[in-house]
Every structure is written in structure tokens, then in C-alpha cells.
């Protein structure tokens, strides 16, 4: 009997030991991520997703696309999310955040520095910089061209001023972003191959970064105003988030597009007499040559607006 009892005790001891190891391993695996998530929270976040999940799913079926959404009402901390932690190619949305990094790392006077570039530096879709090869442009004008006109050469110059794609990634890491991967310059970063994590992020992470730059403490007030004014003047987003909000709402946004039907828009939106709303909507399709749908972004925005009223 004593032997059986000892065997039984041994089995119990082994089970407890394995359970202890499992819990320890789980903590080791998730602890870092949980700590990062905790650092991102600035207040109690209230989620409102039950009513919107079905609507976003229906939009995916309607447009034959995958959609990632994250929105936060900065006045109430209510959030809307859908596939908010899934990766999407960020495409040209990075230009607004890279402009924020540029402002973070440089004085406002630096924006008056004249940057010269050659015809060989030009890449596809550079409607502003291609007109100034002979004269160069002020750094502030280049940042504005990247944000407002989505000028790709301007985007590359922004990258160069902050240490390249990896310099951009490093700056975001310092802000608590352990998600965004930035690897390539324009225009290769728009390749957007499904499953390729290069030049990708999530709707939640992008919205969190945009919030930090536009209403948070990542920039002082004077620099925040410069960035948001650039975004308010965006010339490429009229059919996107702007099309999904009431006409009396003010929108500052940055769009993006790429292969595989990639269409994105990120924005800070000011409803009348309310705190701003931060919105990130990312989308993609399965086929490389698939056309993107601006209307998908507009209708996803309508779902967000209705849910946050």
C-alpha cells in the first residue's frame, strides 16, 4: 500500500510540475505582448463591436475583400474594431506617420532646409517633386507633398531624413509599436503580397500611432498643428473616409493603395462640438491585379460613424 501511495504521490507531483511549467511558459510567451498592450492604454477603453461586426462582414462579402478597422472616439474612449490585429500592407499611409517622425526628430526651422534631388531620384507617381528637380524643395514642402499629394519621391526623401524604412520602424518602436514592419522604399513597399509581413502593420497599431501624433504627446502642440494641417489638405482622399462622414465634419487623412486590391485610409476626424475620432481602415483582396474599391472605405466609415453617435 505504501508503494502505491508513493506512486500516486509521484504522479500527482509530476502533473503539478508539468502544469507549473505550462503556466510559466505561457507567461513567458505572452508577458511581453501584454506589457506592450498595457503601455498603449491611456484610459479605460470601451468597445462597441457587437452591432458592427456583422456589418463589416457584410461589406467584405459585398466587395470580395478583407477589411481591418480600428476607430477610437478620443472623447469617450469608445472603440470600433474589426480584424484590427490582422496585418495589411500599409502602403502610402506611412507618409503621414513618417512626417510625424520627421517633426518629432527635427526643429520647425529645419523644415526650411532646401533639399536637392536629381531626375534619377524620381520614382513613379511624383507629381510635385518632378516639377522641382532643378530648384530643389524645402523639407517642409517635401513633407507636405508626401502627405497631401502622396508624392512617392517625397516619401523616399522623408524616409532618408529619418534613417530609411528601418529608421522609421525604430522611431515607432520607441513609441511602443512592436507590430509595424518597414523594410522597403517607394515604390516596392506597395507590393502587398499576401502573407509577406514586410511593410505591414495593423489597423489598431496605425490608429494608435496616429492618435499619438495628432492628439497625444508624441509631438508638441505647434508640431501637431503642422501635421494635421497637412492632413486636412490631402488631395487623394475625397472618396474615402471623407465620403463616409457628414459634410460638416472636418477630416485630415492619408490614403494608400497597392497591389492585391490594397486600399487604405487613416484619418483624424473632427465632428462639430466633439473630441476628434481616429480612424484606420485597411483593405486587401486575393488577386494581384484586383481593383480596389474606394466605396468600401466610405461605407466602412459610415458604419463607424453610426456606431459612435
UniProtKB/Swiss-Prot annotation:
It is an enzyme of class 3 (hydrolase). It comes from the Bacteria. One of its GO terms (biological process) is beta-lactam antibiotic catabolic process. Gene3D superfamilies: DD-peptidase/beta-lactamase superfamily (3.40.710.10). Belongs to the class-A beta-lactamase family. PANTHER family: BETA-LACTAMASE, BETA-LACTAMASE-TYPE TRANSPEPTIDASE FOLD CONTAINING PROTEIN. This is Beta-lactamase. It comes from Bacillus thuringiensis. The gene is bla.
